Design a protein with these regions (language model features):
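Consensus positions within tandem repeat domains that build extended binding/scaffold surfaces
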Residues: 18-23, 41-46, 63-68, 85-90, ...
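Structural signature of tandem-repeat unit edges
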Residues: 3-16, 27-39, 49-61, 71-83, ...
Length: 190
């Protein structure tokens, strides 16, 4: 934790980590390869500002704030990921897209303040939390064909959103609070 001069670490055999294990290790640069990681601790790589790519081929569930504020992170390789936890990628300004076809659950704030995300591919997401894409103003459309449940504020703060394809919304009898709060570009709700 806060080993700001630590430049690299061999994670090739690591399956589990404690909380804050590499929090603020600013010396980490380039790619993190975690071929066996299955149980990451909370805040694991938070504020590791120079990580550019992450590979975790067997990871199914992320941890809270796992890569939050990893501002250079641009490439994510997690081919079996099922769950993105609270604020896992908050303020990851290097991300320009979300391409996670295996993900089924995205929890509150997961991609909030990722200001350069422009495209989203989450075809199998069944559940999303609030403010998942808050302050992601470059996202103009979103498609969530498999969505089954969401919380209030699910699309809140998507200021560039102009259209959406979310079949579940057409079946609602009650609209949750803050569903489209601050979606300033949205002109119609079907």
């Amino acid at each position: 934790r806060e080993c700001i001069t630590l430049k690299n670490v061999d994670l090739s055999n690591v399956t589990t980590t404690g909380d804050y294990a590499f929090f603020r290790c600013w010396g980490f640069t380039g790619e993190l390869n975690m071929p066996k990681l299955t149980a990451p601790g909370k805040y694991l790589f938070r504020e590791c500002k120079n990580i550019t790519k992450v590979s975790a081929p067997v990871l199914e569930n992320m941890s809270l704030y796992m890569f939050a504020e990893c501002t250079a992170l641009a490439d994510i390789d997690m081919p079996v990921l099922k769950k993105v936890e609270n604020f896992s990628f908050n303020k990851c300004e290097g991300l320009t897209k979300v391409d996670m076809p295996t993900v089924e659950t995205v929890v509150a704030g997961a991609f909030s303040n990722c200001v350069n995300i422009a495209t989203v591919n989450l075809p199998n997401v069944k559940s999303i939390g609030g403010t998942v894409f808050n302050n992601c103003s470059l996202i103009t459309s979103i498609s969530l064909p498999a969505l089954q449940t969401f919380t209030g504020g699910a699309f809140s703060g998507m200021t560039g959103l102009t259209s959406y394809d979310v079949p579940l919304l057409a079946t609602l009898e009650t609209v949750p609070s803050s569903l489209f709060q601050n979606c300033k570009s949205l002109t119609a709700i079907d």
